[in-house]
Amino acid sequence: KHAQRIETWILRHPGFTIMAAILAYTIGTTHFQRALIFILLTAVAPSMTMRCIGISNRDFVEGVSGGSWVDIVLEHGSCVTTMAKNKPTLDFELIKTEAKQPVTLRKYCIEAKLTNTTTESRCPIQGEPSLNEEQDKRFVCKHSMVDRGWGNGCGLFGKGGIVTCAMFTCKKNMKGKVVQPENLEYTIVITPHSGEEHAVGNDTGKHGKEIKITPQSSITEAELTGYGTVTMECSPRTGLDFNEMVLLQMENKAWLVHRQWFLDLPLPWLPGADTQGSNWIQKETLVTFKNPHAKKQDVVVLGSQEGAMHTALTGATEIQMSSGNLLFTGHLKCRLRMDKLQLKGMSYSMCTGKFKVVKEIAETQHGTIVIRVQYEGDGSPCKIPFEIMDLEKRHVLGRLITVNPIVTEKDSPVNIEAEPPFGDSYIIIGVEPEQLKLNWFKKGSSIGQMFETTMRGAKRMAILGDTAWDFGSLGGVFTSIGKALHQVFGAIYGAAFSGVSWTMKILIGVIITWIGMNSRSTSLSVSLVLVGIVTLYLEVMVQADSGCVVSWKNK
């Protein structure tokens, strides 16, 4: 716990950290002594109640298109939360991707039965035998030759013809279906964070709004009761080449298989357009004609091929099914228009009465906390005063996920979600003299979170792919580069310079660039210049974390 406090103190006090390093280097005579002195200085520092520089609140909004548009990536199994100034916090979750009305390419019979077996034979030199069933496509037939003579009804010895037919009926089949990208339907749930009910992405009740996205209607508006309208413009990205893949459906299971493998299966089949279901092609692949004896020939059908197919499909991607529709994975790249959204309760006054904790603070898996409080004072509806402060109660830290929490009526529980900083902090609810002051310690590492966020940013840029880049104009190129730098390096930059003033950040960027330009080593020079330019760019350009944005399109 103390090591975590040291890390937090170092990140918030880069100036004092540099001074400690210089002091340790000056006092110590060996590398071991210098390292020991530096560790001792930083270990003592967190306990000295020195001047603390708090981390400012940030709105993590994906995209660099000003205040109106926000770019997000939705994936199955994940939830995206968007926050913007004076806008409600929204949860977006992609809950379902369905293939509607896939076209049947081919049907295969995997279990059959034989009935109405008939045999006709001829003696030598009497010609080929024939049956009327041979003209019926429902029957499977085979011509053979058999030894004939006096012992089995023929006057001459020699080879005589024999034909056997049996009616082929399929008991169980499997289908191969082709999915067209335009038949995919994406279901998204949009849920505003509300204090009245702790709304999450899968809440489709009072607060959540379910919308459908298809390639034909990629732009959709969602009316959020009490919060206005959000517009979504989405471009589906399944990551699958449906021209080369077929969905093999067997009863209530489905697999994604290669098209050519599916077409080469040695089983009786029907074209997908066949509506009769009886004129099977290659029926003989499931039928065995035994050796004929004079006027008799036995014919048997092979057993069910379902087990063999399950074995052959080992390792194939299994696709889930729901109500006859096929469910896919994949992701959506969406652009949100938030200019028609509004916050509830902006005109309410602050609550001045007493609050009590209904449910103790609970930590979520996302690094946030949820606390349930109840207002016992008068004057509702009103806004809930909520702050997260350092131990000296001088600097506001962390951020509020449930933007502008409000009390609609007295004694009604309200859920509030917030993200405290790593280490010790105070959660303060209400106003003096009846404030709730709750101490909280958040486990984890700021540096570890920095690298984790950087990896998520790089992954997001990879998912966005070519849609993240605009080469149509010079401005588009620079905007795309800015988006990439912000997505990937924004977390490292924020953690490294969280306690440094704007002027000092500019100066550090200039110094790094100047050192790089004057370095004799080519590799070192290029590296330092790139680091300096990225540092300057992330400081000078506003990239949706904090600051002001001017939208020339809305002038």
From Swiss-Prot:
Q: Which residues are glycosylated?
A: 116, 202
**Annotated positions for site Cleavage:** 49-50, 544-545
Extracellular compartment: which residues? Answer: 1-7, 50-494, 543-555
Identify the stretch(es) annotated as Fusion peptide. 147-160
Q: Per the record, a Pfam family?
A: Flavi_glycoprot
What does the UniProt keyword field contain?
Clathrin-mediated endocytosis of virus by host, Cleavage on pair of basic residues, Disulfide bond, Fusion of virus membrane with host endosomal membrane, Fusion of virus membrane with host membrane, Glycoprotein, Host endoplasmic reticulum, Host membrane, Host-virus interaction, Inhibition of host innate immune response by virus, Membrane, Secreted, Suppressor of RNA silencing, Transmembrane, Transmembrane helix, Viral attachment to host cell, Viral envelope protein, Viral immunoevasion, Viral nucleoprotein, Viral penetration into host cytoplasm, Virion, Virus endocytosis by host, Virus entry into host cell, Zinc
Domain topic, free-text comment: The transmembrane domains of the small envelope protein M and envelope protein E contain an endoplasmic reticulum retention signal.
Q: Which NCBIfam families match?
A: flavi_E_stem
Put simply, this protein is called Genome polyprotein
Supply the source organism for this entry.
Dengue virus type 2 (strain Thailand/TH-36/1958) (DENV-2)
